[in-house]
Protein backbone atom coordinates (compact mmCIF):
# COMPACT_ATOMS: atom_id res chain seq x y z
CA UNK A 1 0.00 0.00 0.00
CA UNK A 2 2.88 2.36 0.73
CA UNK A 3 3.95 2.09 -2.93
CA UNK A 4 0.42 2.48 -4.31
CA UNK A 5 -0.27 6.10 -3.41
CA UNK A 6 2.82 7.81 -4.91
CA UNK A 7 1.80 6.46 -8.32
CA UNK A 8 -1.58 8.17 -8.00
CA UNK A 9 0.00 11.54 -7.30
CA UNK A 10 2.89 11.44 -9.76
CA UNK A 11 2.93 14.44 -12.07
CA UNK A 12 0.38 16.53 -10.21
CA UNK A 13 1.32 20.20 -9.83
CA UNK A 14 2.22 21.44 -6.38
CA UNK A 15 -0.45 23.26 -4.42
CA UNK A 16 0.39 26.96 -4.30
CA UNK A 17 -0.23 29.41 -1.47
CA UNK A 18 0.42 27.14 1.50
CA UNK A 19 2.92 27.60 4.34
CA UNK A 20 4.11 24.49 6.19
CA UNK A 21 5.67 24.06 9.62
CA UNK A 22 6.23 21.24 12.10
CA UNK A 23 5.64 21.06 15.85
CA UNK A 24 6.46 18.30 18.31
CA UNK A 25 4.34 17.84 21.42
CA UNK A 26 4.38 15.40 24.33
CA UNK A 27 1.97 12.49 24.48
CA UNK A 28 0.46 10.94 27.59
CA UNK A 29 2.93 8.04 27.51
CA UNK A 30 5.99 10.28 27.32
CA UNK A 31 6.04 9.83 23.55
CA UNK A 32 6.71 12.57 21.03
CA UNK A 33 3.88 13.44 18.63
CA UNK A 34 4.74 15.23 15.40
CA UNK A 35 2.20 17.73 14.09
CA UNK A 36 2.31 18.94 10.48
CA UNK A 37 0.80 22.41 10.20
CA UNK A 38 -0.39 23.83 6.87
CA UNK A 39 -1.54 27.45 6.71
CA UNK A 40 -3.04 29.53 3.90
CA UNK A 41 -0.36 32.04 2.91
CA UNK A 42 -2.85 34.84 2.31
CA UNK A 43 -4.97 34.48 5.45
CA UNK A 44 -5.91 37.71 7.20
CA UNK A 45 -7.46 37.31 10.61
CA UNK A 46 -8.55 34.12 12.30
CA UNK A 47 -9.70 31.16 10.21
CA UNK A 48 -11.06 27.70 11.07
CA UNK A 49 -8.66 24.85 11.77
CA UNK A 50 -9.02 21.22 10.76
CA UNK A 51 -7.33 18.63 12.93
CA UNK A 52 -6.70 15.91 10.36
CA UNK A 53 -6.44 12.28 11.47
CA UNK A 54 -5.22 10.17 8.56
CA UNK A 55 -6.70 6.93 7.27
CA UNK A 56 -5.18 3.47 7.33
CA UNK A 57 -7.44 1.47 9.62
CA UNK A 58 -5.71 2.81 12.76
CA UNK A 59 -2.95 0.36 11.86
CA UNK A 60 -1.20 1.54 8.67
CA UNK A 61 0.19 4.59 6.86
CA UNK A 62 1.48 7.88 8.29
CA UNK A 63 0.62 11.57 8.27
CA UNK A 64 3.81 12.28 6.31
CA UNK A 65 2.63 10.11 3.39
CA UNK A 66 2.16 11.93 0.11
CA UNK A 67 -1.61 11.49 -0.17
CA UNK A 68 -2.20 13.06 3.24
CA UNK A 69 0.27 15.90 2.69
CA UNK A 70 -1.58 16.66 -0.53
CA UNK A 71 -4.98 16.63 1.16
CA UNK A 72 -3.79 19.01 3.88
CA UNK A 73 -2.31 21.33 1.26
CA UNK A 74 -5.53 21.30 -0.77
CA UNK A 75 -7.57 22.19 2.30
CA UNK A 76 -5.18 24.92 3.45
CA UNK A 77 -5.21 26.47 -0.02
CA UNK A 78 -8.96 26.86 0.41
CA UNK A 79 -8.51 29.02 3.50
CA UNK A 80 -8.16 26.90 6.64
CA UNK A 81 -5.34 25.92 8.97
CA UNK A 82 -4.77 22.16 8.85
CA UNK A 83 -2.92 20.19 11.52
CA UNK A 84 -1.98 16.61 10.61
CA UNK A 85 -1.29 14.28 13.53
CA UNK A 86 1.43 11.62 13.40
CA UNK A 87 -0.34 9.39 15.89
CA UNK A 88 0.89 5.97 16.92
CA UNK A 89 -0.97 3.24 15.11
CA UNK A 90 -1.29 -0.49 15.55
CA UNK A 91 1.13 -1.68 12.90
CA UNK A 92 2.98 1.24 11.35
CA UNK A 93 6.50 2.63 11.33
CA UNK A 94 6.23 3.92 14.91
CA UNK A 95 5.85 0.36 16.17
CA UNK A 96 2.90 -1.78 17.25
CA UNK A 97 0.64 0.45 19.31
CA UNK A 98 -2.90 -0.97 19.50
CA UNK A 99 -5.90 0.80 20.99
CA UNK A 100 -5.93 3.22 22.76
CA UNK A 101 -2.48 4.64 21.85
CA UNK A 102 -3.59 6.35 18.64
CA UNK A 103 -6.66 7.82 20.30
CA UNK A 104 -4.49 9.10 23.15
CA UNK A 105 -2.27 10.91 20.65
CA UNK A 106 -5.22 12.41 18.77
CA UNK A 107 -6.65 13.67 22.06
CA UNK A 108 -3.29 15.21 22.99
CA UNK A 109 -3.16 16.94 19.60
CA UNK A 110 -6.68 18.30 20.02
CA UNK A 111 -5.92 19.76 23.43
CA UNK A 112 -2.68 21.31 22.13
CA UNK A 113 -4.48 22.90 19.19
CA UNK A 114 -7.22 24.22 21.47
CA UNK A 115 -4.61 25.75 23.81
CA UNK A 116 -2.85 27.42 20.85
CA UNK A 117 -5.89 28.83 19.04
CA UNK A 118 -4.82 32.43 19.45
CA UNK A 119 -1.19 31.78 18.48
CA UNK A 120 -2.23 29.96 15.30
CA UNK A 121 -4.99 32.40 14.38
CA UNK A 122 -7.72 29.79 14.73
CA UNK A 123 -11.40 30.68 15.08
CA UNK A 124 -12.98 27.21 15.18
CA UNK A 125 -11.69 23.62 15.43
CA UNK A 126 -13.05 20.79 13.30
CA UNK A 127 -11.80 17.25 13.85
CA UNK A 128 -11.77 15.32 10.59
CA UNK A 129 -10.44 12.13 9.06
CA UNK A 130 -11.20 9.39 6.56
CA UNK A 131 -11.62 5.63 7.06
CA UNK A 132 -9.56 4.70 10.15
CA UNK A 133 -9.08 8.43 10.64
CA UNK A 134 -12.87 8.70 10.60
CA UNK A 135 -12.94 6.22 13.48
CA UNK A 136 -10.44 8.32 15.42
CA UNK A 137 -12.34 11.49 14.54
CA UNK A 138 -15.58 10.21 16.05
CA UNK A 139 -13.79 8.57 18.98
CA UNK A 140 -11.89 11.79 19.75
CA UNK A 141 -15.21 13.62 20.01
CA UNK A 142 -16.70 10.89 22.21
CA UNK A 143 -13.68 10.98 24.47
CA UNK A 144 -13.69 14.78 24.67
CA UNK A 145 -17.30 14.63 25.82
CA UNK A 146 -16.52 11.92 28.38
CA UNK A 147 -13.51 13.83 29.74
CA UNK A 148 -15.25 17.22 29.88
CA UNK A 149 -13.29 18.70 26.96
CA UNK A 150 -16.02 18.81 24.35
CA UNK A 151 -15.80 22.62 24.20
CA UNK A 152 -12.44 22.16 22.45
CA UNK A 153 -14.31 20.90 19.37
CA UNK A 154 -16.61 23.08 17.28
CA UNK A 155 -17.43 20.48 14.64
CA UNK A 156 -16.76 16.91 13.53
CA UNK A 157 -16.41 15.81 9.89
CA UNK A 158 -15.95 12.07 9.38
CA UNK A 159 -15.39 10.58 5.93
CA UNK A 160 -16.17 6.90 5.20
CA UNK A 161 -15.68 6.02 8.88
CA UNK A 162 -14.43 2.54 9.80
CA UNK A 163 -16.33 2.14 13.04
CA UNK A 164 -18.19 -1.12 13.63
CA UNK A 165 -15.50 -3.76 14.08
CA UNK A 166 -18.11 -6.29 12.90
CA UNK A 167 -16.26 -7.49 9.83
CA UNK A 168 -15.81 -11.21 10.42
CA UNK A 169 -19.57 -11.85 10.56
CA UNK A 170 -21.49 -8.71 9.54
CA UNK A 171 -25.00 -8.18 10.93
CA UNK A 172 -27.89 -7.83 8.48
CA UNK A 173 -28.29 -4.11 9.20
CA UNK A 174 -24.82 -3.48 7.75
CA UNK A 175 -25.67 -4.99 4.37
CA UNK A 176 -23.03 -2.99 2.51
CA UNK A 177 -20.32 -5.08 4.16
CA UNK A 178 -21.51 -7.97 2.00
CA UNK A 179 -22.97 -6.13 -0.99
CA UNK A 180 -19.86 -4.03 -1.64
CA UNK A 181 -17.23 -6.55 -0.59
CA UNK A 182 -14.41 -6.39 -3.13
CA UNK A 183 -15.05 -2.91 -4.48
CA UNK A 184 -11.54 -1.58 -3.77
CA UNK A 185 -11.84 -2.75 -0.15
CA UNK A 186 -12.20 -6.39 0.86
CA UNK A 187 -13.91 -7.45 4.05
CA UNK A 188 -11.26 -9.97 5.05
CA UNK A 189 -8.60 -7.24 4.98
CA UNK A 190 -10.54 -4.86 7.20
CA UNK A 191 -11.23 -7.73 9.60
CA UNK A 192 -7.47 -8.32 9.83
CA UNK A 193 -6.84 -4.63 10.44
CA UNK A 194 -9.46 -4.64 13.20
CA UNK A 195 -7.68 -7.55 14.88
CA UNK A 196 -4.41 -5.62 14.78
CA UNK A 197 -6.05 -2.60 16.41
CA UNK A 198 -7.61 -4.72 19.16
CA UNK A 199 -5.46 -7.88 19.19
CA UNK A 200 -7.11 -9.51 22.20
CA UNK A 201 -10.63 -8.61 21.12
CA UNK A 202 -11.42 -6.96 24.46
CA UNK A 203 -12.83 -3.71 23.06
CA UNK A 204 -15.38 -4.92 20.52
CA UNK A 205 -18.27 -2.97 22.07
CA UNK A 206 -16.26 -0.03 23.43
CA UNK A 207 -17.41 3.13 21.61
CA UNK A 208 -13.97 4.69 21.97
CA UNK A 209 -12.53 1.80 19.95
CA UNK A 210 -15.54 1.28 17.66
CA UNK A 211 -17.85 4.35 17.73
CA UNK A 212 -20.67 2.48 15.97
CA UNK A 213 -21.50 1.03 19.40
CA UNK A 214 -22.06 4.43 21.03
CA UNK A 215 -25.41 4.86 22.74
CA UNK A 216 -27.58 7.89 23.26
CA UNK A 217 -25.86 8.75 26.54
CA UNK A 218 -22.48 8.79 24.74
CA UNK A 219 -23.73 11.02 21.92
CA UNK A 220 -25.96 13.58 23.61
CA UNK A 221 -24.32 16.99 23.80
CA UNK A 222 -21.78 16.46 21.02
CA UNK A 223 -21.00 19.33 18.61
CA UNK A 224 -22.36 19.41 15.04
CA UNK A 225 -21.30 16.50 12.83
CA UNK A 226 -21.06 15.83 9.12
CA UNK A 227 -20.71 12.25 7.89
CA UNK A 228 -19.81 11.33 4.32
CA UNK A 229 -19.98 7.84 2.85
CA UNK A 230 -19.16 6.30 -0.52
CA UNK A 231 -21.97 4.49 -2.32
CA UNK A 232 -19.87 1.42 -3.25
CA UNK A 233 -17.98 1.18 0.04
CA UNK A 234 -18.36 -1.85 2.33
CA UNK A 235 -18.32 0.68 5.20
CA UNK A 236 -21.20 2.73 3.81
CA UNK A 237 -23.94 1.48 6.11
CA UNK A 238 -22.05 1.91 9.38
CA UNK A 239 -21.48 5.56 8.54
CA UNK A 240 -25.16 6.01 7.72
CA UNK A 241 -26.13 4.26 10.94
CA UNK A 242 -23.92 6.57 13.00
CA UNK A 243 -25.53 9.61 11.38
CA UNK A 244 -28.98 8.33 12.35
CA UNK A 245 -27.80 7.65 15.91
CA UNK A 246 -26.54 11.21 16.18
CA UNK A 247 -29.86 12.61 14.98
CA UNK A 248 -31.78 10.40 17.41
CA UNK A 249 -29.60 11.74 20.24
CA UNK A 250 -30.42 15.34 19.29
CA UNK A 251 -27.04 16.09 17.70
CA UNK A 252 -26.96 18.24 14.57
CA UNK A 253 -25.74 15.93 11.80
CA UNK A 254 -25.74 15.99 8.02
CA UNK A 255 -24.89 13.08 5.76
CA UNK A 256 -23.57 13.05 2.20
CA UNK A 257 -23.52 9.95 -0.02
CA UNK A 258 -20.92 10.24 -2.78
CA UNK A 259 -22.58 8.34 -5.59
CA UNK A 260 -20.64 5.91 -7.76
CA UNK A 261 -17.48 5.92 -5.64
CA UNK A 262 -15.60 3.25 -3.74
CA UNK A 263 -14.05 3.57 -0.30
CA UNK A 264 -12.42 7.00 0.20
CA UNK A 265 -12.23 7.54 -3.57
CA UNK A 266 -13.05 11.22 -3.15
CA UNK A 267 -9.90 11.79 -1.07
CA UNK A 268 -7.60 9.30 -2.81
CA UNK A 269 -8.11 9.57 -6.57
CA UNK A 270 -7.17 13.22 -7.08
CA UNK A 271 -6.03 12.73 -10.70
CA UNK A 272 -8.78 10.36 -11.83
CA UNK A 273 -11.81 12.22 -10.42
CA UNK A 274 -10.58 15.77 -9.74
CA UNK A 275 -14.10 17.21 -9.65
CA UNK A 276 -15.22 14.79 -6.93
CA UNK A 277 -11.99 15.37 -4.97
CA UNK A 278 -12.46 19.14 -5.18
CA UNK A 279 -16.10 18.83 -4.15
CA UNK A 280 -15.17 16.96 -0.98
CA UNK A 281 -12.46 19.47 -0.13
CA UNK A 282 -14.92 22.34 -0.62
CA UNK A 283 -17.55 20.60 1.47
CA UNK A 284 -15.20 20.09 4.41
CA UNK A 285 -13.94 23.67 4.30
CA UNK A 286 -17.50 24.94 3.90
CA UNK A 287 -18.57 22.96 6.96
CA UNK A 288 -15.75 24.52 9.00
CA UNK A 289 -16.77 28.02 7.95
CA UNK A 290 -20.45 27.33 8.65
CA UNK A 291 -19.94 26.75 12.37
Pin down the residues of each PLM region.
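Ser/Thr- and Pro/Gly-biased, low-complexity intrinsically disordered regions
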Residues: 1-3
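Alpha/beta-hydrolase superfamily serine-hydrolase fold, recognizing
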Residues: 5-291
